[in-house]
Amino acid sequence: MGATERLIAFKVSLIMSVRMLGLFMLFPVMSVYASGYENSTPFLIGMAIGIYGLTQAFFQIPFGYLSDRFGRKPLLIAGLLIFFLGSIIAANTENIIFVVIGRAFQGGGAISAVLMAFLADSVSEDNRAKANAFVGFQIGVAFMLSLIIGPIITSKIGLSGLFWSIGLLSIVAMLIVFSLKQSKPINYYRLSIGAFKETLSRELVTLDFSVFSLHLILASGFIVMPLLIMKNQIVSMADNWQLYLPAVLFSFIGMVPLIIISEKFKKTKYILLLSILLLIISQIVFFISDLNFSVFLITLTIFFVAFNSVEAILPSLLSRTASPSKRGLAMGIFSTSQFLGTFIGGAIGGLIYDIYDLNSVFLFTIFV
């Protein structure tokens, strides 16, 4: 990538990672601390965690379409303002119901598709997988930092303070958006059945289903992996970053050669199939093995190599396949599929665990 493309990829990844850092910080603390809210029940705590994915899925397509019509930058600012409003609602309440409402607003700022469309608009086709991999790396860094920072902030200033911190991060993301060049709409089109048909070709639907399945596996897996760590006494909950941090770092080292082979030697299909095979192998090992620290770390690394490779390749394939004028809408459908996969994966994974046992969830993900 040239200097201009690298700068754009850096800014987009920074916006995405700052926003995702705010969201990820809730994961290790929400279920523990939310029981202190008024009217708190396990169901409402679950709603506070999961409703974000539902509203994200619902608003991805409208945001993608509107960005095709009015440009990417105005929609990015609008989405971050909505996200900020949701953070403020959640920060200024002692009632779990208003936390749920605040989280719903956070999800309503659905800018993921708009950001990826902006990146695709600004980076040449040959460099899109590299740019997507860079964005994925930054999100991975944000995830690892969140596992450490989230519990520290919450232990000092509570969940309310954490939501204020998340709101502050959304302001930081907005400042970065203001530094982006205005992206003018390529073409105006009416949101019609015909427009949707253009984004529902066999190739695009296959990519949508692929990202749905990928995030279904991720959500289902992360219901049980922390529990398996505790069950097998691999590390304490406070120290689980000792597994996640090296696994993510090693996985990015393993992912880079796969992306280079995919792009430089035009072997995208083979790398995609290899990554899917690695994904299946990781789920089989989780299902059948007696887990200790080393086995868990190696298996988790294989899982992240596969997941991150597929996560980088799919948006690149989508941007090549979708028509430029409908790219925002296509990215919206793609992101909707991703968030629906997360929500449904969490719901089904939790149901299987409730009815059967932990390992049965991996049996489910093997066949997905």
Over which residues does each language-model region extend?
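Conserved MFS/SLC helix-loop-helix module at the cytosolic interface between two early adjacent transmembrane helices
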Residues: 58-94
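Juxtamembrane intracellular "pre-TM" segments in multi-pass secondary transporters
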Residues: 1-5, 181-210
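Helix-to-loop junctions at the C-terminal end of transmembrane segments
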Residues: 60-71, 254-267, 353
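Cytoplasmic membrane-interface "Motif A"-like loop-to-helix N-cap segments
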Residues: 69-79, 263-276
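C-terminal transmembrane helical hairpin of 12-TM major facilitator-type secondary transporters
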Residues: 269-314
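Short amphipathic helix-loop junctions that connect adjacent transmembrane helices
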Residues: 28-43, 223-239
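Cytoplasmic helix-loop-helix junction between adjacent transmembrane helices
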Residues: 102-139
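C-terminal membrane-cytosol helix-exit motif in multi-pass small-molecule transporters
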Residues: 167-186
